[in-house]
Curated annotation (Swiss-Prot):
The lineage of its organism: Bacteria, Pseudomonadati, Pseudomonadota, Gammaproteobacteria, Enterobacterales. Transmembrane segments: none annotated. HAMAP family: Ais. Its main location: periplasm. This is Lipopolysaccharide core heptose(II)-phosphate phosphatase. Residues 1-25 form the signal peptide. The keyword Hydrolase applies. It comes from Escherichia fergusonii (strain ATCC 35469 / DSM 13698 / CCUG 18766 / IAM 14443 / JCM 21226 / LMG 7866 / NBRC 102419 / NCTC 12128 / CDC 0568-73).
Length: 193
């Protein structure tokens, strides 16, 4: 009887441990969580595409505007810069893109002050069109990591379409993807630690 109790306790402990590990490996929305170190490892296997929602919008905040009312706040600019410093610690080489709105261009510019931002209006088209925009960029830069600043509805669409999950990104939340044999795969949600 004691042996059965010990086995039961061990089994329950093991299941609890699995639950804790799973909680840290998966987001509450069902997407795998990909931190900076994991992203760096993925980028060694194949070039990655990281899509970020723009930083805090000026027109939806009481925080001080960076400049234009259609752009981002000073806080948003500082948050984008902080994210850029964290991410580029491990991912040194990448091309940087933004949709053609002030808020995405400012977010990308503050993310990496030393990089040229390529503006492409196609990153504002959400739905299946976002995939052709990503593929076009991937074709132009086949062996490079790509970072794109876009919009929450684009990220929500990708998560729903690729993984059938609801994803409601906050400012500067991101998704990690890669292209394999011409097909786009959603690897998971980028998380900051």
């Amino acid at each position: 009887m004691k042996l059965k109790k010990h086995v039961a306790v061990l089994l329950i402990s093991f299941l609890c441990l699995i639950g804790l590990v799973t909680q840290h490996a998966w987001s509450s929305n069902g997407l795998p969580r990909i931190d900076n170190k994991t992203l760096a490892k993925l980028s060694l296997q194949h070039p990655v595409v990281v899509l970020f929602r723009h930083a805090e919008r000026c027109d939806r905040s009481s925080n001080e505007c960076l400049s234009d009312k259609t752009g981002i706040t000073v806080k948003g600019a500082n948050d984008a810069r902080s994210l850029g410093k964290e991410l580029t610690t491990d991912i040194k080489k990448y091309d940087l893109y933004a949709s053609d709105t002030v808020r995405t261009i400012q977010s990308a510019t503050w993310f990496a002050t030393d990089k040229k931002v390529t503006v492409d209006k196609k990153f504002q088209q959400c739905g299946k069109a976002i995939y052709s925009a990503i593929n076009d960029v991937q074709i132009r830069s086949p062996d490079k990591n790509i970072i794109i600043f876009t919009h929450n509805h684009c990220l929500s669409y990708i998560a729903k379409d690729k993984r059938d999950v609801k994803f409601s990104p906050d400012y500067l939340d991101g998704l990690v993807m890669h292209v394999e044999n011409g097909k786009l795969f959603l690897d998971g949600e980028f998380v900051r630690y």
